[in-house]
Amino acid sequence: MVDTALHPIPGRRTPPHPRSTLPLTTPPAAAELFGDNLDKAIAYHESLATDGSVRGFIGPREIPRLWDRHILNCGVIGEAMEEGISVADVGSGAGLPGIPLAIARPDLKIILIEPLLKRSVYLGEVIEQLGLDNVSVIRGRAEEKAVRKQVGHVDVVTSRAVAPLGRLASWSLPLAKVGGRMIAMKGASVAEEIERDAKAIRNAGGGEVKVFTVGGELLDEPTTLISIRREK
C-alpha cells in the first residue's frame, strides 16, 4: 500500500543558502530538506566523513554517497511523522536515521538507542557539537527491561534495517504507546518479510501494516518505509 497523504514537514522555511553558494559536495536537496538547519546537516556530513570513518562507523566506499544514501534518505522520513511527537531510534549506530531526522525536524523529541559504547560516545559528541537540544542517547539494547523503562512509551519507534522484520517488531513495538507506530526503513523485500513474519508482528502487538515511500520530491530513489501500528 502506498500512502500519498503524508504529513507536511512543519517549520520548513526558505533554504538559507542560495544554491549557487552551497559547498560543492552538498546537493541542492539538502538545502530544501534541512532549511535553516543546513549548517548542522553539513557539519554532520563532515563528522561522518572524517571522525565517523576513522572510528569505523562509515566504510570508505560510503563516503562519496553519504548525502544520498544516508543523510537525505534518513531525513525525509520526517514526512511520515506528526508535529511535536516523541521518537525512539533503535540501533542508531552512527546516528542514522535519528540525527538527520532531528536536524530536519527540530520539533521532534528523539531518543537514540545504541548498545555499543564507542558508538554511544560518538552520538553524545555529535549531539553536543551540533547543539541538538531535542536529542538524547541511551546506551543499551531495545529489548532490555532497563532500556524500556528509560524510554517509556513513545509515539514512533524508528530504525534502519537493523534486523529481520519480525525481530525488529519484537524490539520496537513494546517501546511504542498503544496506538503508536514503528516506522522502519526497508528495501524491496519488505512485502516478503511482512508475509513471512506476520505471526511475530501480531505477537509483538502489531496491527495495521502500511508500506509507502517518502522523499519522492527530493530524492532520485524515494525511501521505502513500513509502518506498523501497536494495537495491544
Curated annotation (Swiss-Prot):
Do you know which Gene3D superfamilies this protein is assigned to?
Vaccinia Virus protein VP39 (3.40.50.150)
Q: Which InterPro entries match?
A: rRNA_ssu_MeTfrase_G (IPR003682), SAM-dependent_MTases_sf (IPR029063)
The superkingdom of the source organism is: Bacteria
Sorted alphabetically, the keyword list is: Cytoplasm, Methyltransferase, rRNA processing, S-adenosyl-L-methionine, Transferase
Report the EC number(s), separated by commas if there are several: 2.1.1.-
Alphabetically, the GO molecular function entries are: rRNA (guanine-N7-)-methyltransferase activity
* Pfam families per record: GidB (PF02527)
Which is one Gene Ontology cellular component term of this protein? cytosol
Q: What class of enzyme is it?
A: transferase
Entry's family note: Belongs to the methyltransferase superfamily. RNA methyltransferase RsmG family.
Q: Which HAMAP family does the record associate with it?
A: 16SrRNA_methyltr_G
As for what it does, the entry says:
Specifically methylates the N7 position of guanine in position 518 of 16S rRNA.
What name does UniProt use for this protein?
Ribosomal RNA small subunit methyltransferase G
